[in-house]
Amino acid sequence: MAGNREVITGSDFKRMVSGAYSEFLLEYEHINQMKGAGHASGTHILRTMGAAVLALEDARDAGIGGYAQRMATAAVFGARGAAGVVLAQLFRGIAKGLTGKYTATSSEFGKAFQYGILYAQRIVPEEPERPIITIAKSVAKGAYHAVRADLPITEILGAALQAGENSMKFVDREDAGARIMFTFFAGCLKGLDGNFVSPAISLSLGLVSGQKGMQDPREDLVRPYCVRLSIRNPKIDMEAFKKQLEENSTFALVEPHGKDVLVHLHTDHPGRVVDQAIGWGPLHEVRVTNMSESHVLGAHGALMKVALLAIAENRVQARELQDDGVNVIVSGSEEACPSVGEIVGAAHSDLAERYVLLAWSRDFHLALRQAKRLLGERVELVLACDKAQQAQAMRAFDGEKSALENAKAMREAAGIS
């Protein structure tokens, strides 16, 4: 329809992602029973989506670009499991397409969705092509033709959804990845029309109770901004100051340094933290890092040259890993994968200059690769496929060697290509 002047606002965007969350809320248990995207993929996708939507719950950006960026940042950091990492990249591409926009035309919004699908495709390079990518490509093709025709956004999403439905006959309809991609677009369309059912998170009314047996979405709140600053006040009440900072942070490291007090914390509201700190003395050397983007992380007074970081599903495994020389433990299992943010946060510790990140399940691989993308040379990966292979790798670790040398030796010892 030529001459379409429809405008998509930030409120429209909120409804769409709320609709997608709602659809996953209805479908996640069914998706959990499917194969093709790892263990408990429905739960992981729901928790990833919950982290993304929580970032918008009290956001004040009225513009669609600001909302999209907040959502993408939270999704990348809150991504769990292989499916969650793919979905987070979809959001990241959408945000890229909406950067700097207060509102978007239907065409601009449709192109942003195409960006998102492109980003999702890039994160899964394996052959043969996974069903989630097959569906994504079909959706992108359907959206492309609708965008070229300058159709309203509901018709663009409808065309994309129909293309996805048509492509389902070429893949296993019981594949979890394919169902996830289809469910996402169906939810967006319902949300835009205001037709969604009792989401656990309501962007207009605040948080309400979730389904029985479902993780409380508030526990998936991510704090993806690393704030470091110095305060010139040697007489500061350290405990009172730290307690106030912890109101808006995952942790707060507060240390005296000569006439200054050094602060290092992770938060979802860096502005609030800086505003709090202003009241305690003159600020200088303020640095805010978005940890969901690639960043250089300097080690401040690290105690070790290189450390091992691994994932433990219970206390017994955690003790065994520590006995085998693992220095940092992240809690997680195949049914409850750790988020990218939890892995990155652990590697943000000043314990070591470099880290070797270990995996004992394929379900962790994409999240660890994302951590590597964000942290760069600060970490190296050893991606085993089971606990026995991980144990073989750990026996080759040498604390006197570099992280790069260790990772190479450990992969060779365990037969990891």
Predicted regions and their residues:
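N-terminal loops that bind phosphate or other acidic moieties
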Residues: 1-417
